[in-house]
Amino acid sequence: VLLYLPGVVGIWFFVYLCNAWAFQILVNTSDHDKHLSFAHAFKLTVSGFAFSYTTPFGSGGAPYRVMELSRYIGTPRAVSSVALYSMMHVFSHFFLWTTALLAFVIAHFDVMTAWLWTLFAIFLTVFVAAAVFFSYSYKHGIIARLFRLLFFVPLLRRPARRFYERHATAFDTIDANIRFLYEHPRQLWGSLAAEYLGRLLNSFEFYFILLA
């Protein structure tokens, strides 16, 4: 067991390097004149995930990143950057799962049954739907649309509407920053590639655990 412990723990250093790289790309792909260094991005990445792992429902990481980043690039851009990274982090998981399924099909094609093909087709449908959703979100912005869903929640609709009306400009700025990334596909795909690489490296943690 101890033989594989350095691998289980040490792999996270490289995972966080990829996460920080993706985060840095997203923060620096904006119309502000600030440049987030990789060291600063790495610090926010590691400490942000630490907050996520130690707070209920992993809710502490994103607010912490926004709070720290807002001192550097302002609150609207900080919110949009953190929201973009959260979306990219989730989207990269879909690519990892798709890679795993394709590898399984290629390696075990001769044992694929109708039931397994059905499950594979269902997942591909979900993957395509997720890709369409994220593409639409990046192209049109999504923060304001998601917040307006609170208008239909009892007890929350009135305070949510008042909050939205007071901060409408900030919501527009956040979504404008999200749309700005969509107009720069090189950075968009670069960030996704970095997150995807991080997910691949993260899978080695489970591999080392199984070997142990």
Language-model regions, residue ranges each:
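Predominantly cytoplasmic-facing regulatory/coupling regions of multi-pass membrane proteins
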Residues: 1-46, 113-212
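Transmembrane helix-loop-helix hairpins in multi-pass inner-membrane proteins
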Residues: 1, 48-158
